[in-house]
């Protein structure tokens, strides 16, 4: 009947890390397709149900990797590009949908104890703790007018 909150949490990372190793361009397009365009497509599909909802929150698991302002990485180009594209796309949707009562949230969960990024023993958080912190962020009362990228540690990441 209705959907009040949509959480985009799908994400993949590519296998080629360094430009000197030769990029896998079809793989890069796949990463962009899943990480950025996937959220746009799912949002579009759910809008009729969300229009009838009350909270109208669209929440995205993003990453500090999508921050141009704080970029420190030397590799993982496709992942970084895909998260920057997700953030930019959601900024446009936020501008468009705000007048219809929607709120969009971007969230960086930190390095989670999963196999997505390799050696999971060194990660900051386990998936359960990361999910708890994400939900806290999504339900937190927000006073900012602009869309921001919240981090698991309570900071706001410039992007």
Spans of model-derived segments:
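Conserved hydrophobic beta-strands of the Rossmann-like cofactor-binding core
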Residues: 3-7, 11
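Ser/Thr-centric signal marking residues that sit
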Residues: 43, 82, 114
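Short-chain dehydrogenase/reductase
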Residues: 43, 90, 131
